[in-house]
Amino acid sequence: MKALVLFSGGIDSTTALGLAIKKYGKDQVIALSISYGQKHDKEIRAAIAVAEYYGVEHLFLDLSKIFQYSNCSLLQQSMEEIPEESYAEQISKTNGDKPVSTYVPFRNGLFLSSAASIALSKECGVIYYGAHADDSAGFAYPDCSPVFNQAMNEAIWEGSGHQLKIEAPFVNVSKAEVVRIGLELGVPYELTWSCYEGGEKPCGKCGTCIDRAAAFQANHVEDPALR
């Protein structure tokens, strides 16, 4: 069976890619990177580097027009600044009543639906994506939750005529556990990019930089991307 991996070039999707390659072999794995109108292309460039490292087929899709009406702080047209604080701090300000400002409206739903069409066309039987438990905690990113994953899996399974399913290996584990798994796999974290800003180096202040640093610290390992 062939696998398609939703692949951003960050820690989570790169670890998911590593797992898929371990299970199916690189010749049976396709990486799909999706542009959604984000403020920089650092993630895409990282994705290209990692895909080349593994030697997998790499596809690209542009969904930026779908998100042109959103004011999510990650997007080019947004007037909002990307928050320089942890997700926990952001959630505390809203009591968890709404997602964080870096939540792109229903992004994972659109990504998975688009990936399903491509996966079926490429004769894949499974879609991997790297949502983890920390993302859905406190309603920060509701399209990363186990409930969302189950609903999308059922929709894609039925809509594909029982030919395609979702594999979300980290949906019930923390980012620290994702990094632990990746370290065991020998994932090239030095090639990945997580920061929401597009600077020469990671800002170290945005929510995803803070989460990334904590995940490596929990594993008592220096982040290789910062060496």
Can you say where each PLM-predicted feature lies in the sequence?
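Short, intrinsically disordered, charge-biased short linear motifs at domain edges
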Residues: 182-184, 189-198
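ATP-dependent adenylation/nucleotidyltransferase module used to activate substrates
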Residues: 1-186
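Short cysteine/histidine-rich metal-coordination sites, predominantly Zn2+-binding motifs
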Residues: 198-199, 220-227
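Short functional micro-motifs and their immediate structural scaffolds
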Residues: 25, 188, 211-214
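Short amphipathic alpha-helical interaction/hinge segments
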Residues: 160, 217-220
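Local cysteine-cluster metal-coordination motifs and their immediate loop/turn environment
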Residues: 109, 113, 193-214
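Glycine-rich nucleotide phosphate-binding loop and flanking beta-alpha elements
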Residues: 135, 216-217
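A short pocket-lining beta-strand/turn micro-motif at the edge of beta-sheets
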Residues: 162, 189-191, 202
